[in-house]
From Swiss-Prot:
NCBIfam families reported in the protein's UniProt record: lipA, PRK05481.1, PRK12928.1
Residue numbers binding [4Fe-4S] cluster 1: 76, 81, 87, 316
Protein name, entry field: Lipoyl synthase
Source organism phylogeny: Bacteria, Pseudomonadati, Pseudomonadota, Betaproteobacteria, Burkholderiales
UniProt-annotated binding residues for [4Fe-4S] cluster 2: 102, 106, 109
């Protein structure tokens, strides 16, 4: 006789507890920000968006191996940069210090969020050894946001700069910093001990989109960081970068460019925003090459010493060539 007794459904697994020390990516990261990401119909990539796939070239594999051996991170990997294949293949990388967990949750960015680990005291020496081993003549050093540190990580930047210059005195150093919000004066005073060859801090987008795209950041504060650094170090080139395609207007981008020049910023990058995953902010427009060309022309009219503008341009993409064009190297 058939047993018609219903079998109880298995109990739903309990929701896993939030672990602030875990590295959160994609949905786990963006689910906890106050701004809800509303999906829109995905735009078809136009023909001018072409990414060179990461390859297994010997140079590509050599860099990845050396990075792992020295327990180092690159923003190329952590932020899923579309140019990683080209850059690694040519022996260049943007080093990301102070760990791989950011204290911010910017929904355009693919770097993981979480409670950061303690600073690695060996990282400056490991970084310098890696740069020397790779015989790099120009390096970019960036970091996650470290709102947990009293100096925002400025002291660690200084230690890295000192170690690189000790082991590779001919190497030019660009730093791409967080905003040091709430600790700007302290951070700038610390950076006085070892200023870089190029000081880069990205505005990322227009002020109207800050609440959506850069929660925890402030447009006016970022401009002040750049201007205050330049006032302290007039001979050091300053630089900033923007993404387009998030819903900004052309006039808004041009106004940001004017704001940058009014705050004594020398160099500019503008590139197309590409959505890292469906859980990140959507692409609202693929900006036409003609518009990028217009931005470039306007940048030089405004007095920027160098402007790298184009769909696949990123803040540190061909940074050595950008610096050379601006007369830094």
């Amino acid at each position: 006789m058939t047993d018609l007794t219903a079998t109880p459904a298995p109990a739903e697994p309990a929701a896993s507890a939030y672990d602030p020390t875990a590295k959160q990516k994609a949905q786990a990261k963006t689910a906890r920000i106050p701004i809800k990401i509303v999906p829109i119909e995905k735009l078809k990539k136009p023909e001018w968006i072409r990414v060179k796939a990461a390859t297994g070239s010997s140079r590509f594999n050599e860099i990845k191996t050396i990075l792992r051996e020295h327990n180092l991170h690159t923003v190329c990997e952590e932020a899923s940069c579309p140019n990683i294949g080209e850059c690694f293949g040519k022996g260049t990388a943007t080093f990301m210090i102070m760990g791989d967990k950011c204290t911010r949750r910017c929904p355009f960015c693919d770097v993981g969020h979480g409670r950061p680990d303690p600073l690695d005291a060996d990282e400056p020496k490991n970084l310098a050894r890696t740069i020397a081993a790779l015989k790099l003549k120009y390096v970019v050093i960036t970091s996650v946001d470290r709102d947990d540190l009293r100096d925002g990580g400025a002291g660690h930047f200084v230690e890295c700069i000192r170690e690189v210059r000790e082991q590779s005195p001919a190497t030019r150093i660009e730093i791409l910093t967080p905003d040091f919000r709430g600790r700007l004066d302290r951070a700038l005073a610390i950076l006085n001990a070892a200023p870089p060859d190029v000081m880069n801090h990205n505005l990322e987008t227009v002020p109207r989109l800050y609440k959506e795209a850069r929660p925890g950041s402030d447009y006016a504060h970022s401009l002040k960081l750049l201007k205050d650094f330049k006032a302290l170090h007039p001979d050091v080139a300053t630089k900033s970068g923007l993404m387009v395609g998030l819903g900004e207007t052309t006039d808004e981008i041009l106004q940001v460019m004017r704001d940058l020049r009014a705050h004594d910023v020398d160099m500019l990058t503008i590139g197309q925003y590409l959505q890292p995953s469906e859980h990140h902010l959507p692409v609202r427009e693929y900006v036409h090459p003609d518009t990028f060309k217009m931005y470039e022309e306007e940048a030089y009219k405004m007095g920027f010493t160098h402007a790298a503008v184009g769909a696949m341009v990123r803040s540190s993409y061909h940074a050595d060539l950008q610096a050379h064009g601006a007369g830094v190297v």
